């Protein structure tokens, strides 16, 4: 552009256009490189206009800030990986297209990390944009989610979905988000009369086509528009969500199965990302344990059809429920359709409105998975109805609750385990509250440990052999001086205080024993049972009342052949243990008492030594001697053998049952030798052989298997006097060495 100056006044050339005209002309002709026009005028009004244009090669400059930055590819193709060149996410990549290798362009194989050497190659899938899942045949037209979107936008979305059919498109996963992404969805679905209400039906995009929701809204004409809009929305979503992933629907490695974005988890491969995603899915979706707080009540997700009546929506426009009817709130509806909705269990709009906006990220992406992808265990979890009043956020709605008429039908808990369905289990029954102050009021006298030790000593001498009794006595003698030294200065009040501390400790252990599923038993230092869990009773058959001395102890199983054999064949020689031991039955109360029902009249609990076999009892007292005064908070982990609770009738029924089922003895004798484990109870062909203690072996004295007239003489063991009358012979295995009495 040129300008001439004559007589101090500027006179532009008539043929040359002005600066504005030339700028507009250059913008229309070359829009890619618009000129920069600068005009300078002096004080006399004269000036020159200069224009400069950037060269075309400027955009190719590497240091140009306007140069488009290349995104780093998730994984390079095989050709670019070998050539150590930059690749792209598209397949085939641009470099392979230029070289004519588009048919052979595929993702390269990375070197496995050390912690992935044992992982299969199928688990190490390519990146989120790899072509592992080909959706070219399963891609469907994605419906327009914005009500005011133009046709060009919808065509652009459809072209984008078709062009990226070979990749895992985020559009397909977007439909599974419970949280809405645009405020225009609310205005598109809501009827005009409900603009002031807080119901957002757009969250029905998260419902799966397999979930059929029945809305009975015909009674209210104002909600008919809502029901029609919901049906249209559900039908459009059903066509969209029906088998959205084609053949990869049941593939556990597919990321959409757990509805989370692997690319946002910053993992180098899918193996680690899927592992953490599955753990999160199990922690949030599989349990579905309803918390106690009604403000955050989630409950279990119902998978079957639910019934929504018009009463829950209100009978007028001023009585609309301010709740969301999406996946988070359908959890508390009865899946069997037997109960109506409880509005106290549903989220309010004020509490969730801050999370539903499009400016916030999609939190809890794993928990908002579609209903058909959820764990089947959530369908069987018990439903829970709370009666907690509304929170402060629903204060404006509490004045209209009298018009809603919710029907709170009591719902029974459903148990998914087949073995527990036939048992009368009371789910959710709270433990009766008991104040610890009752312990200090009830304990008035100390516990008689002296009588307990005397009873323990008498029991050990009767049951065990002298050799085993000596081993137990040595263990107790090692702690006897220390025990006497610590208790000789205690007076009556100290002993009462010690018993209160013991009962207070049992009160604390009660919750622990009930909460823990491990068989647990607590005993005093005398070995008397003080507390027992129900799992221990189930395991051994010992009732809690029997162990605590509240019922008679009729056990005959002592871990040796003395218990069951002689008591069955010779019933006249059987004497209940409670009549000739430290326990005797009170004829008035039927309870076992100490000292044959003496003056004390104290009920006698079962000793721990009665529950164990001989070797386990010796090992217990040896460990007890080490921990009694050496380490007050020590513990020993060991193994032991427990004896099941068996009465005389149980042993007789067991013996007769085995005798009837087994036929054909040796040399024509009926019945064979049987060994029952509970513990060592041995019965022979036609007679019984009894022993007491591990070192006592009794049998016939060198009976000849070939001589049927040989009879076994009576034998006695070193631990007790056991009488054995052999009417036949012991056949099959020869004879054991006999100890004559």
Swiss-Prot record:
Chain residues forming the annotated DNA-binding region: 77-105
Transcription among keywords: yes
Keyword vocabulary terms for this entry: Activator, DNA-binding, Gluconeogenesis, Metal-binding, Nucleus, Transcription, Transcription regulation, Zinc
Subcellular location: Nucleus
GO cellular component: nucleus
Superkingdom of origin organism: Eukaryota
Residues passing through the membrane, by range: none
Residues covered by region (Disordered): 1-70, 135-163, 202-239, 285-321, 401-421, 559-590, 655-741
Gene Ontology biological-process entries: cellular response to starvation; gluconeogenesis
Bias (Polar residues): 25-61, 202-226, 291-321, 401-416, 573-586
A molecular function GO annotation: RNA polymerase II transcription regulatory region sequence-specific DNA binding
Pfam families attached to this UniProt entry: PAS_13
Basic residues: bias regions: 723-732
Keyword Acyltransferase attributed: no
Function per UniProt: Transcription factor which regulates nonfermentable carbon utilization. Activator of gluconeogenetic genes.
Family, per entry: Belongs to the ERT1/acuK family.
Listed PANTHER family: TRANSCRIPTION ACTIVATOR OF GLUCONEOGENESIS ERT1 (PTHR47659:SF1), ZN(II)2CYS6 TRANSCRIPTION FACTOR (EUROFUNG)-RELATED (PTHR47659)
Name of the featured protein: Transcription activator of gluconeogenesis BDBG_05438
């Amino acid at each position: 552009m040129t300008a001439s100056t004559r007589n101090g006044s500027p006179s532009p050339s008539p043929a040359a256009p002005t600066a504005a005209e030339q700028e507009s002309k250059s913008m229309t002709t070359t829009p890619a490189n618009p000129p920069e026009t600068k005009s300078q005028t002096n004080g006399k009004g004269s000036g020159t206009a200069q224009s400069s244009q950037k060269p075309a090669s400027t955009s190719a400059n590497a240091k140009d800030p306007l140069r488009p930055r290349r995104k780093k590819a998730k994984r390079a193709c095989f050709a670019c990986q070998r050539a150590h060149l930059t690749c792209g996410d598209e397949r085939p990549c641009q470099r392979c297209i230029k070289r004519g290798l588009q048919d052979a362009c595929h993702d390269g194989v990375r070197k496995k990390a050390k912690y992935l050497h044992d992982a299969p190659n199928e688990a190490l899938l390519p990146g989120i944009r790899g072509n592992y899942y080909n959706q070219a045949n399963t891609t469907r037209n994605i419906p327009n989610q914005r009500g005011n979107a133009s046709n060009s936008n919808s065509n652009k979305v459809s072209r984008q979905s078709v062009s990226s059919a070979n990749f895992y498109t985020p559009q397909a996963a977007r439909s599974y988000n419970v949280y809405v992404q645009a405020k225009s969805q609310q205005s598109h679905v809501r009827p005009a009369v409900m603009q002031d209400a807080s119901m957002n039906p757009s969250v029905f995009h998260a419902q799966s086509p397999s979930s059929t929701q029945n809305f009975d809204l015909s009674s209210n004409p104002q909600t008919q528009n809502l029901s029609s809009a919901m049906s249209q929305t559900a039908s459009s979503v059903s066509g969209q969500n029906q088998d959205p992933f084609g053949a990869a629907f049941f593939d556990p490695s597919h990321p959409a199965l757990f509805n989370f974005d692997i690319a946002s988890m910053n993992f180098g491969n899918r193996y680690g990302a899927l592992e953490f995603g599955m753990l999160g899915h199990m922690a949030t979706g599989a349990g579905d344990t309803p918390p106690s707080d009604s403000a955050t009540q989630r409950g279990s997700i119902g998978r079957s059809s639910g019934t929504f009546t018009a009463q829950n929506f209100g009978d007028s426009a001023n009585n609309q429920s301010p709740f969301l009817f999406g996946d988070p709130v359908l959890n508390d509806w009865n899946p069997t359709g037997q109960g109506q909705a409880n509005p106290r269990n549903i989220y309010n709009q004020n509490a969730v409105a801050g999370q539903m906006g499009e400016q916030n990220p999609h939190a809890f992406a794993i928990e908002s998975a579609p209903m058909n992808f959820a764990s089947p265990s959530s369908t069987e979890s018990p439903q829970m109805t709370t009666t907690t009043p509304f929170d402060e956020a629903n204060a404006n709605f509490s004045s209209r609750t009298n018009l809603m008429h919710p029907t709170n039908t009591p719902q029974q808990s459903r148990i998914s385990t087949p073995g527990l369905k036939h048992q009368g289990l009371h789910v959710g029954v709270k433990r009766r509250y008991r104040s610890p102050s009752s312990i200090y009021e009830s304990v008035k006298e100390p516990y008689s440990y002296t009588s307990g030790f005397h009873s323990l000593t008498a029991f050990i001498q009767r049951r065990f052999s002298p050799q085993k009794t000596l081993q137990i006595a040595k263990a107790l003698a090692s702690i006897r001086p220390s025990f006497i030294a610590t208790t000789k200065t205690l007076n009556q009040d100290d002993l009462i205080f010690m018993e209160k501390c013991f009962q207070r400790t049992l009160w604390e252990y009660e919750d622990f024993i009930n909460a823990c599923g491990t068989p647990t038993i607590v005993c005093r230092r005398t070995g008397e049972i003080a507390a027992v869990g129900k799992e221990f009773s189930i395991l051994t058959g010992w009732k809690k009342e029997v162990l605590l001395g509240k019922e008679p102890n009729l056990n005959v199983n002592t871990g040796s052949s003395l218990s069951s054999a002689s008591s069955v064949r010779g019933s006249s020689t059987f004497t209940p243990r409670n009549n000739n031991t430290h326990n005797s039955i009170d004829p008035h109360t039927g309870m076992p008492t100490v000292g044959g029902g003496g003056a004390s009249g104290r009920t006698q609990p079962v000793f721990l030594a009665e529950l164990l076999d001989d070797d386990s009892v010796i090992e217990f007292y040896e460990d007890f001697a080490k921990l009694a005064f050496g380490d007050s908070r020590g513990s020993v982990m060991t193994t032991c053998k427990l004896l099941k609770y068996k009465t005389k009738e149980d042993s007789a029924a067991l013996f007769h049952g085995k005798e009837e089922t087994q036929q054909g003895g040796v040399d024509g004798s009926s019945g064979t030798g049987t060994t029952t484990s509970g513990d060592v109870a041995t019965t022979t062909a036609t007679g019984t052989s009894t022993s007491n203690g591990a070192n006592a072996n009794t049998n016939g004295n060198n009976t000849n298997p070939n001589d049927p007239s040989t009879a076994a003489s009576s034998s006695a063991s070193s631990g007790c006097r056991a009488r054995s009358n052999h009417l036949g012979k012991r056949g099959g295995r020869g004879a054991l060495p006999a100890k004559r009495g």
